[in-house]
């Protein structure tokens, strides 16, 4: 059907590259390796169905619904050059009690983890070390 044809049109390396070049502030992060990694799931059986379910999913839950109930501390990293989600949205999410830190990332777009792993990874490593339970804390002894 129409959905399968649409999937087949966008599940091409050149199309994925064009989309990423719009989303990423750091254009040099859009590498052939990244495109190949992102294309792998498109080759799986059932990929069309998953894609159609994802693109047709317009009902909740919204981040604000989840942040309200989140039972653990949260951190938000947000690229200040994100063309699709304005930084003001991330700043609004930072007002939820579960959000302990909001960190804007200068010069980064929609996918900070891919665009700027040298910024994101140390922040997340420190966050995990700060909030992770000590080994054995949940052993029941």
Sequence positions of predicted segments:
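Conserved alpha/beta-hydrolase catalytic His-Asp/Glu region
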Residues: 5-69
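Glycosyltransferase donor-binding loop in the core domain
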Residues: 8, 43, 82, 109-112
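Generic structural signal for small/hydrophobic residues in well-ordered secondary structure
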Residues: 19, 38, 51, 76-79, ...
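Active-site helix-initiating loop/hinge in glycosyltransferases
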Residues: 62, 86-89, 115-116
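Conserved loop-alpha-helix segment in the C-terminal half of the alpha/beta-hydrolase fold
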Residues: 69-108
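Catalytic active-site module of serine/aspartate enzymes centered on a nucleophile-bearing elbow/loop
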Residues: 98-141
């Amino acid at each position: 059907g129409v959905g399968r044809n649409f999937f087949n049109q966008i599940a091409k390396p050149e199309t994925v590259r064009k989309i990423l070049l719009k989303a990423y502030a750091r254009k040099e992060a859009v590498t052939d390796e990244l495109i190949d990694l992102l294309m792998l799931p498109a080759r799986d059986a059932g990929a069309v169905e998953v894609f159609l379910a994802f693109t047709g999913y317009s009902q909740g839950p919204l981040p604000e619904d989840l942040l309200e109930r989140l039972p653990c501390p949260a951190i938000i990293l947000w690229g200040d050059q994100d063309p699709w989600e304005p930084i003001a949205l991330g700043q609004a999410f930072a007002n939820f009690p579960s959000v302990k830190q909001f960190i804007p990332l200068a010069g980064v777009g929609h996918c900070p983890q891919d665009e700027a792993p040298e910024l994101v990874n140390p922040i997340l490593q420190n966050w995990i070390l700060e909030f992770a339970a000590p080994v054995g804390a949940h052993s029941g002894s």
